[in-house]
Amino acid sequence: MSIRLTNISKKFGQFQALSPLNLDIQEGEMIGLLGPSGSGKTTLLRIIAGLEGADSGHIHFGNRDVTQVHVRDRRVGFVFQNYALFRHMTVADNVAFGLEVIPKKQRPSAAEIQKRVSHLLEMVQLGHLAQRYPEQLSGGQKQRIALARALATQPEVLLLDEPFGALDAKVRKELRRWLRSLHDELKFTSVFVTHDQDEALELSDRVVVMSNGNIEQVNTPIELYAQPNSRFVFDFLGNVNRFEANWQQNRWTNGDAFIVPPEQTPLQQNGALYVRSHELALADKPNSQAHIPFTIVAITPIGAEVRVELAPIGWQSEELWEAKFTHHHLQELGLQKGSVVYATPRTGYFFGKQGDGSPIRQSWPFLPPGSLAFDI
């Protein structure tokens, strides 16, 4: 079932929760609504569900205008972050609940309900827990039961509000993979809310990035990461360092630091160069391409990677910089906390001083022999 949102807006008192926005969701897509708290993503999800009314605009499920249709008649399944399971009911009864409260004329037979519940529990790999109660389940098991209950009524659209937010990191990762696999198997249209960038990029066919009630960008995870269209999107996707640059003497400067742009660059202006943590090289000496001195303030192993936190020396940055390396690469570099190092960007994304529009990608693929004091 496709979803089309046209000119949707919402106010709570004087607060503009959603500015007029438009969004088309194709049948069978999994869409992630990503943004910080207060961005409007949950309000938008609730409006799609019918739990909130829009102040303006229209919502279509396929060719059906559901703008004024009550939530019970929209054929929507909803999964909450806190599961919302009934503690006094068994797992099987929780899954069956949505079917048993359907008006009698439309309600499946008792045998059909039992058959559907058994099938759903097997599908979520929890058939052996049918007679247990929610308090006897783990967080991950509860979320699977909540999903099975949402699917029991065979909804046209599945909506999920931060479905894995209450779970630990390992369980979240496992459930993300499981949900994506289930979605690909059943091919239902689904929309979920998250503030977790990794979750949005891993699960979504397309990501909708939101801020202050507006849609900032809609794209596939790969394209969104490769081509963020604004400073906000770049900042929110995380793991990015920002060099506030003044154009002087054919290079970008900031205090004692400088970066020489690639040859023939048209960007002879002030602005900001964004450099991702894995696109930053470190060495114990500066070079002709860049002079960006730091003190290493922390070295933190994170799984297969090591995060190096860097404090600027002689120039200004609002935040510490980060560089990421493999454990092997870190050993080769011989970095230690308290050491002075010099950074060089491999790739950067330049925004002009106004910060409007898409960034211009800058790459330093090679330099003339002898121009570097170390190999990048």
Swiss-Prot record:
User: Reaction catalysed by this chain?
Assistant: sulfate(out) + ATP + H2O = sulfate(in) + ADP + phosphate + H(+); thiosulfate(out) + ATP + H2O = thiosulfate(in) + ADP + phosphate + H(+)
Q: What keywords are annotated for this sequence in UniProt?
A: ATP-binding, Cell inner membrane, Cell membrane, Membrane, Nucleotide-binding, Sulfate transport, Translocase, Transport
Per UniProt, ATP binds at G35, P36, S37, G38, S39, G40, K41, T42
Q: Which GO terms describe its biological process?
A: sulfate transmembrane transport
**Annotated ranges, domain ABC transporter:** 3-237
- Record's keyword annotation contains ATP-binding: yes
In terms of PROSITE patterns, this protein maps to:
ABC_TRANSPORTER_1, ABC_TRANSPORTER_2, CYSA
Give the record's GO CC terms: ATP-binding cassette (ABC) transporter complex
**What compartments host this protein?**
Cell inner membrane
Molecular function (Gene Ontology), one example: ATP hydrolysis activity
Its biological function? Part of the ABC transporter complex CysAWTP involved in sulfate/thiosulfate import. Responsible for energy coupling to the transport system.
Q: What is the protein's quaternary organization?
A: The complex is composed of two ATP-binding proteins (CysA), two transmembrane proteins (CysT and CysW) and a solute-binding protein (CysP).
Give the family per the record. Answer: Belongs to the ABC transporter superfamily. Sulfate/tungstate importer (TC 3.A.1.6) family.
Name this protein carries in UniProt: Sulfate/thiosulfate import ATP-binding protein CysA 1
Source organism of the structure: Shewanella oneidensis (strain ATCC 700550 / JCM 31522 / CIP 106686 / LMG 19005 / NCIMB 14063 / MR-1)
- Supply the gene name: cysA1
